[in-house]
Design a protein with these regions (language model features):
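TPR/TPR-like alpha-solenoid signature
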Residues: 11, 18-19, 58, 98, ...
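Amphipathic alpha-helical segments of tetratricopeptide repeats
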Residues: 2-3, 39-43, 81-85, 89, ...
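Residue signature of alpha-solenoid helical repeat architecture, marking inter-repeat boundaries
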Residues: 8-12, 51, 91, 132
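Residue register of alpha-helical TPR repeats
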Residues: 15, 55, 95, 135-136
């Protein structure tokens, strides 16, 4: 059984893995980013930090999009969305719906994209979780989403 210090330490190590993973994304080293995020996810799972696990899983989906692996991205998004539903995190659901909508949009599936963007807006408007921690997650998601959009524009 882990004590509070061990859980805190494990949580911090997971956060550090994520910070380095985002740096890997900046360097376009997506394989390394995936490895680091998976390490962070394993650590979070071991201490039962469900919400952060779902947030990082959503980020892993974004990195898979950068690697053009839509099926793995959707797997991550759907698991993250299901977890967000279970823990009743409207802010996290908004983030996931937004990412799914972006994926659908890039595939030209505009009707599905619009539905997801509407769900994202509705969830965010109803969220009471607009805390600093949520803001940090939105900043990470936003940064990686910009990287994805830049990549798709360059490929067009």
């Amino acid at each position: 059984m882990m004590n509070a210090v061990d859980k805190y330490s494990t949580d911090n190590i997971a956060d550090n893995e994520m910070i380095i993973a985002v740096e890997d994304v900046v360097k376009k080293d997506y394989d390394s980013a995936v490895v680091r995020i998976k390490k962070a996810l394993a650590r979070l799972k071991s201490i039962g930090h469900v919400e952060k696990y779902a947030e990082y899983l959503n980020i892993l989906g974004l990195v898979y999009e950068l690697e053009n692996d839509e099926s793995k991205a959707f797997e991550c998004y759907l698991e993250s969305l299901a977890t967000a539903e279970i823990i009743r995190s409207r802010d996290l659901k908004a983030m996931v719906y937004s990412n799914i909508g972006s994926s659908y949009s890039k595939m030209g599936r505009d009707k599905e994209a619009q539905r997801c963007f509407k769900e994202a807006r509705d969830e965010y408007d109803s969220s009471s979780e607009k805390s600093e921690e949520c803001h940090k997650s939105w900043v990470m998601f936003d940064y990686i989403n910009h990287a994805i959009n830049d990549r798709y524009v360059a490929l067009s």
